[in-house]
């Protein structure tokens, strides 16, 4: 749908309707239905074809002065009739930079590189503890920490550009879950370096999933039901709970690998690392369960405000309850 809208030109809503009660903007294809009259109608219907015509000439002459003047004219029209909702120059510049650098598309590769290298050297250190290895591991630890800082700045930038918390759709939820996973991985880094490396690996996998072809990364307006302060509270808590759960998953997998490679010669060192990972795993699952439970109660409050009932046994509510029960059983059965 996004590609179709872009190719047809419908996504380019660049003309504000003067004095519209809802500050509506329309694309060139929608001008006939916009109800513009007089000079406004003449200007909006002629300026874009004229601009594209000058661009064609500019390609041949390599002089874009006329095109730039027409573009500035459109900019002036937007400022005059759409100032109420038009983003500030700072926000526009930031969005251009955000799309230009596309941080979230590059982060999976960087996280994956840091994770694999740190995992390799950390596993080698289990068998041969050398000062040089510790320096290399700490270097990759810092590298992953810098990636997390960049990840955080990307989320903050998207928040500022969109004007709402960046976990309102599938794409934003995925990059936020990835952030939460890496956050808790770094929070537990004092206990085990394997935790940081494992967290970076699963973070890379989660971020890569955000770029599946059915997921739309567009920054869009909130749906009416999501335009609530509960988006900041309920969704932030319940979606962030997936972070420690994802951390628990990857730590469990790494623990199984260590158990598989344990033998009589390395049993003592392996057991120590497995025990550390097990403690961290228990803490991660406990934190995740607490956040999921709190988030579920907050969701009930939001549902009551939006639909007049706390619980309706819809798929999301039902599976949230099932998840709470499953993780509660796992934690109490340890």
Where in this protein do the model-derived segments appear?
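Soluble extramembrane regions of membrane proteins in the secretory/endomembrane system
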Residues: 1-97
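Short, charged, amphipathic alpha-helical segments
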Residues: 65-72, 134-140, 278
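Cytosolic-side membrane-insertion boundary helix
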Residues: 85-116
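Membrane-interface segments at the starts/ends of alpha-helical transmembrane spans
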Residues: 97, 227-231
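Hydrophobic cores of alpha-helical transmembrane segments in multi-pass integral membrane proteins
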Residues: 104-127, 137-164, 168-220, 230-262, ...
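Juxtamembrane inter-helical linkers in multi-pass membrane proteins
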Residues: 262-274
């Amino acid at each position: 749908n996004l590609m179709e809208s872009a190719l047809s030109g419908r996504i380019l809503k660049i003309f504000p309707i003067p004095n519209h009660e809802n500050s509506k903007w329309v694309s060139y294809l929608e001008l006939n239905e916009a109800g513009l009259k007089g000079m406004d109608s003449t200007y909006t219907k002629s300026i874009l074809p004229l601009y594209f015509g000058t661009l064609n000439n500019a390609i041949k002459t390599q002089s874009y002065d006329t095109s730039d003047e027409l573009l500035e004219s459109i900019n002036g029209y937007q400022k005059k009739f759409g100032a109420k909702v038009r983003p500030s120059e700072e926000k526009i510049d930031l969005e251009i930079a955000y799309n230009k650098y596309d941080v979230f598309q590059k982060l999976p590769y960087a996280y994956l590189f840091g994770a694999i290298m740190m995992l390799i050297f950390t596993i080698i250190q289990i068998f041969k503890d050398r000062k040089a290895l510790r320096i290399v591991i700490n270097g990759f630890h810092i590298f992953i920490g810098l990636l997390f800082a960049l990840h955080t700045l990307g989320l903050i930038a998207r928040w500022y550009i969109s004007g709402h918390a960046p976990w309102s759709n599938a794409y934003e939820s995925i990059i936020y879950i990835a952030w939460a996973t890496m956050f808790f991985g770094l929070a537990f880094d004092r206990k085990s370096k394997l935790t940081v490396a494992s967290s970076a690996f699963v973070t890379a996998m989660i971020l890569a999933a955000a770029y599946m072809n059915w997921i739309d990364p567009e920054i869009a307006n909130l749906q009416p039901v999501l335009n609530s302060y509960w988006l900041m509270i309920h969704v932030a808590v319940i979606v962030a709970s997936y972070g420690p759960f994802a951390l628990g998953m990857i730590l469990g997998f790494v623990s199984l690998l260590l158990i598989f490679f344990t033998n009589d010669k390395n049993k003592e060192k392996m057991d120590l690392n497995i025990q550390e990972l097990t403690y961290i795993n228990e803490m991660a699952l406990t934190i995740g369960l607490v956040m999921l439970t709190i988030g579920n109660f907050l969701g009930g409050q939001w549902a009551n405000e939006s639909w007049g009932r706390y619980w309706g046994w819809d798929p999301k509510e039902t599976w949230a309850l099932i998840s709470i029960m499953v993780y509660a059983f796992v934690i109490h059965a340890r």
